[in-house]
């Protein structure tokens, strides 16, 4: 992926603005909170996975999923949902692969949000 990431490939900005009642500043404020909090949620999921704690993994993935919904990041949302399901079922070997995907998607979302915060919404 090149350095000028297409934010629309990672974020559904139309849906994001709809959820924020068209308020770009509100969305950007929520994005700032997401940038601070989501690494903690992802780290909690990874820690639960390392402890082989399916219940803890499901809880951490569920919390991350709730945050992701507000950002309208569809690929990350699907990965977080899958991680939660695998944690609930105790399928931790597969969950390890999905957790890595969540971490990759999260990094992409963070990059897109930082670009959005500094460069603004596309016109």
Predicted feature locations:
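Two-component system phosphorelay core
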Residues: 1-123
